[in-house]
């Protein structure tokens, strides 16, 4: 058995969002009061209030799986519940 100590490192939310921005990772954002829709696109800017500038944004209907291209948008941080890397489409 190994005697190595496992170090747990806390990742700050701003660092993760910045990594998504730097790596141009396609992300999905869950909306606060609308569970039937999510937004997918690329983060190209954000601020300390988690207001996000989103490029190539698409609105995804979770019931029908339909997609609506909406382009570049500014999403207020108050509307964001969760941000994660979007799954690659097959």
From Swiss-Prot:
Residues 14-89 form the Sm domain. It is found in: Nucleus; Cytoplasm, Cytosol. GO terms for biological process: spliceosomal snRNP assembly. It comes from the Eukaryota. Keywords: Cytoplasm, mRNA processing, mRNA splicing, Nucleus, Ribonucleoprotein, RNA-binding, Spliceosome. GO terms for molecular function: RNA binding. One of its GO terms (cellular component) is U1 snRNP. Disulfide bonds: none annotated. Belongs to the snRNP Sm proteins family. Core component of the spliceosomal U1, U2, U4 and U5 small nuclear ribonucleoproteins (snRNPs), the building blocks of the spliceosome. Plays a role in pre-mRNA splicing as a core component of the spliceosomal U1, U2, U4 and U5 small nuclear ribonucleoproteins (snRNPs), the building blocks of the spliceosome. This is Probable small nuclear ribonucleoprotein E.
